C-alpha cells in the first residue's frame, strides 16, 4: 500500500466517516459515486520471467488503502494498494473427510506456497508491483510505500510478508484423482475408495 499526495487520486476520503453515507445515497438514487466505481481500476497480466510463453501473474491496482486487512477500514490519508494473483499455482492441497457424518467439517489443507515456483513467482510479482509504483512518472502522485514499507526488501522478508498477509483470490477449486492406486480418491465408476456406498 502507498500513501498518495492528493486525496483526488484515492477513494479513501469518500469511503470514511459521514462521506461514505452520502456516497451510499448517491448510489441508491443515481447509481453514481464511489459505489458505482470498480474496486480495481487498473489490471495487468504480466510475466515474471521473460522466457514464459504466457503471463503467469495478474496485478491489480486499487485506488484505496486500508489500515487492517481484516477490518478493511480506509486509511485517514489518501492511499492506494496493489494485489497480485498467480494464475496457475503449482502447490496442491488436500481435503479429507473426518467422520462418516455429512455434518462434520472436512479437514482442508491448502498448502499455499508449498512449491518453490509459487514462492519465487509471488516474490517477483511484489517486486514488479513496487517497480511500477516507484517509476518516475508516479512521483507526481505517490508519496511513499506505507506497507509493507521499505524495510521489507530481501526475498526472505518479502516471502514472510506474503505468508502473513496473503489471501485467496477468486474461487478456490480442485479435483481428485481417479484410478485404482492408493493416491486415487475414486475408482473408474466414481465410487469413493474405502467408503461403501459413497459416490
Language model features with spans:
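Short, glycine/acidic-rich hinge or "gate" loops at secondary-structure transitions
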Residues: 139-151
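A general boundary/transition motif marking the beginning of the first structured unit of a protein
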Residues: 13, 32, 85, 117, ...
Amino acid at each position: 500500500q502507498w500513501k498518495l499526495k492528493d486525496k483526488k487520486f484515492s477513494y479513501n476520503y469518500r469511503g470514511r466517516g459521514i462521506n461514505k453515507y452520502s456516497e451510499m445515497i448517491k448510489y441508491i438514487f443515481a447509481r453514481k459515486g464511489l459505489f458505482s466505481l470498480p474496486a480495481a481500476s487498473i489490471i495487468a497480466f504480466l510475466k515474471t520471467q521473460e522466457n514464459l510463453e504466457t503471463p503467469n501473474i495478474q496485478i491489480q491496482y486499487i485506488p484505496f488503502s486500508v489500515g487492517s486487512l481484516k477490518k478493511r477500514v480506509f486509511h485517514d490519508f489518501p492511499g492506494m494498494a496493489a494485489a497480485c494473483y498467480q494464475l496457475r499455482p503449482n502447490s496442491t492441497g488436500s481435503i479429507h473427510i473426518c467422520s462418516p457424518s455429512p455434518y462434520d467439517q472436512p479437514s482442508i489443507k491448502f498448502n499455499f506456497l508449498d512449491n518453490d515456483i509459487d514462492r519465487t513467482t509471488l516474490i517477483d510479482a511484489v517486486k514488479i508491483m513496487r517497480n511500477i509504483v516507484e517509476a518516475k512518472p508516479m512521483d507526481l502522485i505517490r508519496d511513499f510505500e506505507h506497507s509493507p514499507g521499505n524495510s521489507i526488501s530481501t526475498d526472505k522478508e518479502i516471502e514472510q510478508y506474503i505468508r502473513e498477509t496473503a489471501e485467496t483470490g477468486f474461487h478456490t477449486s480442485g479435483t481428485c484423482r481417479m484410478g485404482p492406486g492408493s493416491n486415487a480418491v475414486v475408482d473408474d465408476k466414481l465410487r469413493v475408495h474405502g467408503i461403501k456406498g459413497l459416490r
